[in-house]
């Protein structure tokens, strides 16, 4: 039996040189000032049609491609499967976005949206539009490159009338299919008591659980252990 957990996590990741940009991005998009916390539980995404609870995962790394290599390992599959979306903040002049996405999409869940947020203000919107057109034909997931400036842009639409920057990211989240989640009418909200565990600890636990599972010779005991670990980790995912 395949367990279907709510896909209600949004990960925001930056490489170290752009941590300051990430701080402002989190405040502007999610109204979140808790940038020192790796997991912010029980956030609410709300628009005129619905409300949904989600957990905000916040992380940084020295090198995004190296981070992706770890994230696409088999041990991290339970974590990938509960991701509604992944937002990567970087300078696309320093990161090769096409190679990065091809590597990333090998393992990403088909319902997970991925947004690359470019913070290099020298990159023209025409270049962004060209890459997005290529990606729209190459991937089935919602994959998008977005230019984002810390100062509010004077133009919020491209030549095709499509939204830009933060407005476009909001639109992607608004139209996302919240798989296995309780989506509430805009007039109704429920309360939950959040559980907390650092993201790094969750990854370590997944790796340890996989090693132990492989060491159990009895298939019934192995299945029982797998179900026990799935239930335990679901409290924090």
Swiss-Prot record:
Entry superkingdom: Eukaryota
Keyword presence, rRNA-binding: no
An example Gene Ontology biological process: vesicle-mediated transport
Record key words, sorted: Chromosomal rearrangement
Any one GO molecular-function label of the UniProt entry: protein-macromolecule adaptor activity
The UniProt record lists the keyword Transcription regulation: no
Biological function: Involved in gross chromosomal rearrangements (GCRs) and telomere healing.
Protein family (similarity comment): Belongs to the IRC6 family.
Protein name: Increased recombination centers protein 6
Organism: Saccharomyces cerevisiae (strain AWRI1631) (Baker's yeast)
């Amino acid at each position: 039996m395949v367990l279907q957990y709510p896909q209600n996590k949004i990960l925001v990741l930056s490489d170290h040189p752009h941590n300051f940009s990430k701080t402002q991005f989190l405040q502007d998009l999610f109204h979140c000032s808790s940038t020192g916390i790796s997991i912010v539980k029980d956030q609410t995404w709300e628009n005129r049609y619905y409300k949904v609870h989600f957990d905000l995962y916040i992380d940084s790394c020295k090198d995004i491609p190296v981070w992706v290599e770890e994230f696409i390992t088999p041990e991290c599959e339970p974590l990938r499967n509960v991701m509604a979306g992944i937002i990567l903040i970087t300078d696309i002049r320093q990161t090769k976005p096409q190679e990065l996405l091809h590597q990333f999409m090998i393992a990403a869940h088909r319902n997970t949206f991925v947004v690359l947020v470019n913070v290099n203000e020298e990159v023209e919107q025409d270049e962004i539009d060209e890459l997005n057109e290529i990606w729209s034909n190459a991937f089935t997931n919602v994959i998008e490159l977005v230019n984002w400036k810390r100062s509010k842009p004077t133009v919020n639409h491209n030549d095709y009338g499509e939204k830009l920057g933060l407005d476009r990211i909001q639109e992607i989240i608004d139209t996302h299919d919240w798989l296995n989640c309780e989506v509430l009418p805009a007039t109704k909200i429920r309360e939950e008591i959040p559980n907390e565990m650092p993201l790094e600890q969750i990854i370590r636990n997944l790796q340890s659980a996989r090693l132990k599972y492989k060491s159990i010779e009895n298939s019934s005991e192995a299945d029982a252990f797998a179900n026990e670990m799935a239930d335990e980790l679901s409290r924090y995912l």
